[in-house]
Regions:
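Short coil-to-helix segment of the ABC ATPase nucleotide-binding domain corresponding to the Q-loop/switch region
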Residues: 89-96
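Catalytic Walker B motif of ABC-type/P-loop ATPase nucleotide-binding domains
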Residues: 154-157
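The feature captures the beta-strand-to-loop junction immediately N-terminal to the Walker
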Residues: 44-46
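Conserved ABC ATPase "signature" region
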Residues: 100, 107-125, 177
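Conserved structural motif at the start of ABC-family nucleotide-binding domains
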Residues: 12, 28-30
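Helix-to-loop junction immediately C-terminal to a conserved catalytic motif
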Residues: 59
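Conserved signature/switch motifs of ABC ATPase nucleotide-binding domains
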Residues: 128-131, 149
Length: 252
């Protein structure tokens, strides 16, 4: 069973938070969930179980109908499934965009963008345009853009869903690199149980009719701050099997 995250270590807390839309549709039953600082929390579950609603709630884009949401930061970035890059702007300009909108001085935002582009392995592509890049490279640009605002909280809505297996794994590596270097708190949606187990410190399994938290798992061998730290493959395989069986044999 999951261990409770103490309030003083949680960046985001949902306390009996639910969501009922104005048409009467209940998207979420009351949910209790805490996101510990500098950890990756992954949401998995079938379509329509309220994962995106929960993510939007964390971002402040929708409010709980009842219960409470506590977010102890305003420094956050939201990464969508579609990279949503400006086609007429260079990669450099796209990565700088969020910092520019926040009023970050030009020299500083250029330096932030340079570091972010280098971190996701796209140094040398600063003058390229989105149409010249592959889908995986455009997603890396989106990830670089998301950190130029220097967020504490990174919210990701199935960001790798459109990528092939090779690029999904590479983007997972990029996310872990960013987490290690910046101590980010991450809330991440995926339909891939393997991806959830690989990336998550805790994994929230949601069910439908309406959306509710089925079970919260703590990883027996989570990502470590040290890149070379070994992980327990057998324990992770067992966790993957448990989650898969809980979701009715869904895709691993």
């Amino acid at each position: 069973m999951a261990q409770r995250v103490e309030p003083d270590t949680a960046l985001v807390e949902f306390a009996a938070a639910d969501k009922v839309f104005t048409n009467g549709f209940r998207a979420l039953n009351p949910i209790d969930l805490s996101l510990a600082r500098s950890e990756i929390t992954v949401l998995v579950g079938p379509s329509g179980c309220g994962k995106t609603t929960l993510l939007r709630m964390a971002a402040g884009l929708t409010a709980p109908s009842s219960g409470r949401l506590t977010r102890r930061t305003e420094r956050m970035s939201y990464v969508f499934q579609d990279p949503t890059l400006l086609a007429w702007r260079s990669i450099q300009a796209n990565v700088e965009l969020v910092a520019r909108l926040q009023g970050v001085p030009r020299a500083e935002r250029r330096e932030r963008a340079r570091r972010a582009i280098e971190m996701v392995g796209l140094a040398g592509f600063e003058k390229a345009y989105p149409r010249e890049l592959s889908g995986g490279m455009r997603m890396r640009v989106s990830l670089a853009r998301s950190v130029t605002s220097e967020p504490e909280l990174l919210l990701m809505d199935e960001p790798f869903a459109a990528l092939d297996e090779f690029n999904r794994e590479r983007m997972g590596d990029e996310l872990l690199n960013l987490w290690r270097s910046r101590g980010l708190t991450v809330m991440f949606i995926t339909h891939s149980i393997s991806e959830a187990v690989r990336l998550g410190h805790q994994i929230a399994v949601l069910g439908t009719q309406p959306g509710h938290l089925v079970r919260l798992f703590r990883s027996p061998s989570p990502p470590a701050a040290e890149l070379a730290a070994p992980r327990d493959g057998a324990a992770l395989r067992e966790l993957r099997i448990q989650i898969s069986e809980m979701l009715g044999g869904a895709r691993i």
